[in-house]
Design a protein with these regions (language model features):
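Conserved G1/Walker A P-loop phosphate-binding module
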Residues: 12-112, 116-137
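Conserved Switch II/interswitch segment of TRAFAC-class P-loop GTPases
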Residues: 70-73, 102-109, 123-162, 166-167, ...
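Glycine-rich, flexible loop/turn motifs
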Residues: 53-61, 68-70, 78-81, 110, ...
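Short capping/connector residues at structural and topological boundaries
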Residues: 36, 62, 67-70, 77-79, ...
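Amphipathic alpha-helical transducer elements in NTP-driven molecular machines
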Residues: 62, 76-79, 92-98, 112-126, ...
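Phosphate-binding glycine-rich loops and adjacent basic patches that engage nucleotide phosphates
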Residues: 42-47, 75-87, 115-139, 151-160, ...
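C-terminal-of-GTPase-core extension/linker across diverse P-loop GTPases
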Residues: 3-36, 41, 47, 174-382, ...
Length: 395
């Protein structure tokens, strides 16, 4: 919900605000997850299943940007219920872009497989979903002959480390020339050499300690692969799903590694996800119930991604559209308004806020307001997950 004050007119203009939001919302930046994994771990099966399931789960149009990129909707019953409440013309969920990172295999940094082709796809993702094989199957040969997910993790991590070292060495060469008469460049070279030594020791960039804020700024320029958040997708056999693979030693090893690494982990069966992708919503619910599951792998991955990246959603609602908007936890009202349109942030006045559950319970914003459940919040208000917001702005 967005309200604008027409310039010099002193009145609320719903039409203009909604038209602006409708016009600009498709350009909203999507969260982007890159899916990596060695051959025969289930990576491509999982990618194909998730993108197809995400396309069927909601009315957001599935988009295949190229054979390795798919956009899926984030399941969110809150906007569906708001859509029913407002008899809205359009329900728009938040979306995630999945990228199937091809060619990231052992020796890729030295030209094996597709060589460094994977770099162009993985560099801009927000987080990496690393599919690791945690199932035994004699009919599916592992590239290294046996199942060892920690070895597989190390193999992929080393390729990312080598790619980062190459980027940093080029940066060092460039900045060394400037360092003769530039103190900031000299400081950057010193930091980069320490960072390269850190990586050469087999450590990820995310564990590198920076001395001060200036180093943090210089570090961020490089957009390093080994600094990206990682979610491990433990691909298991169907029998391991019911108890979340509690007795699977491979999964336990991954969980322990992820805990030390500060990464996320979730259990999934790519083969089951492939079957789920072919079902409609009712069939999917019955299928999951038969398996003793409450949610699909796509839903588990989305939750793990939101948790790891510190994300949440606020909602806007009206007769024309009900929509979920993804923001970082801790985002203040003006910046949340800016997700819809920069004018909303620039001309922010107030945010009329009601909790999603309260709005549903009382049936309208007016009724919730009468109960004292609607707050008029200023620029310092920190938006909460599930807030339904009516922005007031003046431009």
């Amino acid at each position: 919900m967005t309200k604008g004050v027409g310039r010099g007119k002193g009145r609320w203009s719903w039409q203009r605000a909604l038209a602006v939001a409708e016009e600009t919302s498709p350009k909203e930046r999507k969260m982007k997850l890159g899916i990596v994994g060695l051959p025969n771990v289930g990576k491509s099966t999982l990618f194909n299943s998730l993108t197809k399931a995400g396309a069927l789960a909601a009315n957001y149009p599935f988009a295949t940007i190229d054979p390795n990129v798919g956009v899926v909707s984030v399941p969110d019953e809150r906007i569906e219920k708001l859509g029913e409440l407002y008899h809205t013309k359009k329900v728009t969920p938040a979306v995630i872009e999945f990228v199937d990172i091809a060619g990231l295999v052992k020796g890729a940094s030295k030209g094996e497989g597709l060589g460094n082709q994977f770099l162009s796809n993985i560099r801009e993702v927000d987080a990496i979903v690393h599919v690791v094989r945690c199932f035994e199957d004699a009919n599916v040969v592992h590239v290294d002959g046996n199942i060892n997910p920690l070895r597989d993790i190390e193999t992929i991590n080393l390729e990312l480390i080598f790619a980062d070292i190459e980027v940093l060495e080029r940066r060092v060469a460039k900045q060394t020339r400037a360092a003769h008469n530039d103190k900031k460049a000299a400081k950057e070279v010193d930091m980069l050499k320490r960072l390269i030594a850190h990586l050469e020791a087999g450590k990820m960039a995310k564990t590198f300690e920076l001395a001060d804020e200036e180093e943090e700024e210089l570090y961020a320029i490089n957009n390093l692969l080994t600094d990206k958040p990682v979610i491990y997708a433990a691909n298991v056999a169907e029998d391991d799903l019911a108890d979340d693979a509690a007795s699977n030693p491979h999964v336990q090893a991954v969980r322990e590694f992820a805990k030390e690494d500060g990464s996320g982990v979730f259990v999934i069966c790519a083969q089951i996800e492939q079957e789920i992708a072919e079902l409609d919503d009712d069939e999917k619910a019955m299928f999951l119930e038969d398996l003793g599951l409450s949610e699909s792998g796509l839903e588990k991955l989305i939750k793990a991604s939101y948790d790891l990246l510190g994300l949440m959603s606020f909602l806007t609602a009206g007769e024309d559209e009900c929509r979920a908007w993804t923001i970082k936890k801790g985002t203040k009202a003006p910046q949340a308004a800016g997700k819809i349109h920069t004018d909303f942030e620039r001309g922010f006045i107030k945010a009329e806020v009601v909790n999603y559950k309260d709005l549903l319970e009382y049936g309208s914003l007016a009724a919730a307001r009468e109960k004292g459940l609607v707050g008029m919040e200023g620029k310092d208000y920190v938006v909460q997950d599930g807030d339904v917001i009516l922005f007031r702005f003046n431009v």
